Amino acid sequence: MLGAFGQADILINNAGITQPLKLMEIGRGQYDAVLDVSLRGTLLLSQAFIPHMRDRKSGSIACASSVSAQRGGGIFGGPHYSAAKAGILGLAKAMARELGPDGIRVNCVTPGLIGTDITGGKLTEAMKTEISAGIPLGRIGTAGDVAGAFLFLASDLSAYITGAVIDVNGGMLIH
């Protein structure tokens, strides 16, 4: 990446997988798969970019977590998904504290239910209506809603923000 573009100003850790399993259905392989992609992936990719950002004394790392981490479950993810996404919150806050003196900001975005190719085929119109009724803004989020939060974190508008969590859930979870 650096060879092609010369520098990295922002890293967005946005990998994740989910499995709709109950607690007692989760096997080691399933647990490892979800945590490896979400949590270990966030750590390893960050470690790959941090030396470059430290050399430049500048950078922004934005990590995708989930409302599932904050409320202890979601519509599609199992407990291991919630745990992985909660781990990202803790990791990002620890990274913000450690990397701040190096001029590197680290923040999280916690999307709620977002209409994507993953969720699109799993929700009937009746389900969408029922879920939307419980969201104060009255709709399921879009990829653009989430992208806006990441764009903000990539910009100078967030130059004095680190260790923060931006909820993008239409009010699905208010705390």
Segments from the language model and where they lie:
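A conserved structural motif in NAD(P)-dependent oxidoreductases
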Residues: 135-146, 157
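Conserved amphipathic alpha-helix within the SDR
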Residues: 1-6
